Regions:
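C-terminal amphipathic alpha-helical interaction region
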Residues: 1-4, 8, 14, 19-23, ...
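Cofactor-cradling patches in redox/metallo enzymes
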Residues: 28-38, 42-114
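Active-site lining segments that contact anionic ligands and/or coordinate catalytic metals
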Residues: 11, 63-66, 91-93, 117, ...
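Generic, well-ordered alpha-helical scaffold segments in large soluble proteins
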Residues: 1, 22, 33-38, 57, ...
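ATP-dependent carboxylate/acyl-activation modules
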Residues: 1-68, 274, 293-301, 305, ...
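Conserved structured core elements
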Residues: 25, 29, 48-52, 60, ...
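Conserved phosphate-handling catalytic cores of large alpha/beta enzymes
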Residues: 82, 86-91, 95, 100-163
Length: 462
């Protein structure tokens, strides 16, 4: 890990931005740091940036490339539109780098290269972005032929995709036969919503996914030991845990992590692909409804299938929650980044993200416990979860499904605002509306719909 150094403008210039409608910036900021430390002049425009703003800055600074980032599925569509705009304005001489969790190499280097008339590259991570910029620099000074070794072969692309076969037309049923309705309906302890504050950070820390934190957020990797062998996973985690304890201690001392939850249980029914939320068990007043996509191939699943249909004569139940670590951790992380204190920024931001995920996991367990089926977990949790119990949680080895918006089974981010309205998230300082691009603020906030159906697991609807 390294602190940020000022770039040398002679090596090249790049404009970086998170695309319009997306507020995620950790990946983009990491690219900023790596490129700056390797001598590039980086113009980081921030989040929710329109293509017009990127173009204006690129022309102003005579940028050698534009880098676009985005975490959301819909951001991939924004990127496509941005490439069209660059074409229409005759700016296809500007190389473009695309990165983000929703992108794949095949989508960028095969599909989107058919859209953009200029040079387009996929940045799997910050270091691949650096390699692309280095090679573009070699092209500019004549050390490398244009695109020499930079365009993947069909064989290389094939390694990154599943072979595609022409789909035969199929008749899509109104419900999946996999989600049978012979399951017990668990009646919740109350209807409506409640606010929970004062949750112990020590209790939450026990639910941290150390692999996600240490490797994905903090970018640590196992080291080679003196005998030439690589650290085992246990040795690797033992080495990094003191850093985790130190970060947690500092965050507690500074009051940066304030866990809060608003959650509730509601009477619901499925109406085709819709989930109808009722005001009470009489099912006479509809509060709102959520629409979910259905798979176009077997087993034709849709989230609504996990609930009793509206014409069944029975009320079913769903839980919703919004969990947050508060605004202070995001604000402090932004200050650290602005001060070029990269290592501290990366550690604190990653901790905030994974503590929010830990809170979601912890509260999902609490909901299962209150709902009456936590004892069906392979290893029921009593007090602090064991490592075996945690591994089961992270692999969804429990009864219940927890679905968050923005993923393929429930992609509509506007539903985040519905959940915020349903639970009155303002009581825990969480906002979500068109002004926030239907993403929760503060950043370290997440929400979910929780099903009790035993077959409710993660799946992709497409």
């Amino acid at each position: 890990m390294m602190e940020r150094a000022e770039g040398e403008t002679g090596k090249g210039r790049i404009v970086l931005a998170t695309v319009k409608g997306d507020v995620h910036d950790i990946g983009k900021n990491l690219v900023d740091i790596i490129l700056t430390n390797n001598g590039y002049e980086v113009h980081n425009l921030g989040i929710k940036i329109s293509i017009n703003e990127m173009i204006e800055k690129a022309i102003e600074v005579k940028a050698d490339a534009i880098g676009m980032s985005g975490l959301l599925v819909k951001s991939t569509l924004i990127m496509r539109d941005n490439l069209d705009e660059l074409n229409s304005r005759g700016l296809q001489d500007i190389p473009v780098l695309l990165g983000g969790a929703a992108l794949t190499r095949t989508y960028v280097e095969r599909d989107l290269r058919e859209v953009y008339d200029g040079r387009l590259f996929y940045g799997k991570d910050a270091f691949e972005g650096l390699r692309v910029m280095d090679r573009l620099g070699e092209i500019r000074v004549g050390k490398l032929d244009v695109d020499d070794g930079m365009v993947p072969t069909e064989k290389e692309l094939h390694r990154h995709r599943v072979a595609e076969q022409p789909a035969e037309p199929v008749e899509i049923p109104s419900r999946s036969s996999e989600a049978t309705m012979d399951n017990e309906i668990f009646v919740p302890p109350f209807l409506g919503s409640q606010v929970i504050k004062g949750i112990s950070l020590d209790d939450l820390a026990a639910y941290i996914n150390e692999t996600a934190l240490f490797r994905n957020q903090w970018q640590f990797r196992p080291e080679v030991l003196p005998d030439g062998t690589k650290e085992t996973d246990a040795q690797f985690k033992d080495r990094i845990r003191p850093t985790l304890r130190e970060q947690l201690s500092e965050a507690k001392e500074q009051g940066l992590l304030i866990p809060q939850v608003v959650y509730g249980f509601y009477a619901v029914n499925a109406d085709g692909n819709d989930l109808v939320v009722w005001s009470d068990e009489t099912r006479t007043v509809e509060l709102m409804r959520f629409n979910y996509p259905r798979q176009s191939a077997e087993p034709f699943l849709c989230i609504a299938d996990f609930f009793r249909p509206i014409d069944s004569g029975e009320a079913d139940y769903a839980a919703f929650h919004i969990v947050t670590m508060g605004a202070a951790v995001s604000e402090r992380a932004a200050e650290l980044f602005a001060e070029n204190r990269y290592q501290e920024y990366l550690l604190l931001h990653g901790l905030g993200v994974e503590m929010a995920e830990a809170l979601a996991e912890f509260w999902h367990w609490r909901i299962r416990e209150e709902w009456g089926f936590a004892d069906q977990d392979p290893e029921p949790i009593v007090g602090t979860p064991t490592q075996t119990a945690l591994a089961g949680l992270f692999r969804q080895k429990y009864r219940s499904g927890r679905y968050s918006w923005g993923y393929p089974a429930c992609p509509d981010l506007e539903d985040n605002a519905k959940v915020a309205l349903l639970l009155d998230s303002s009581r825990i300082g969480v906002e979500c509306d068109e002004e926030t691009s239907f993403q929760y603020q503060p950043e370290q906030t997440t929400s979910a719909l929780i099903c009790h159906h035993p077959r409710a697991k993660y799946f992709v609807a497409k």
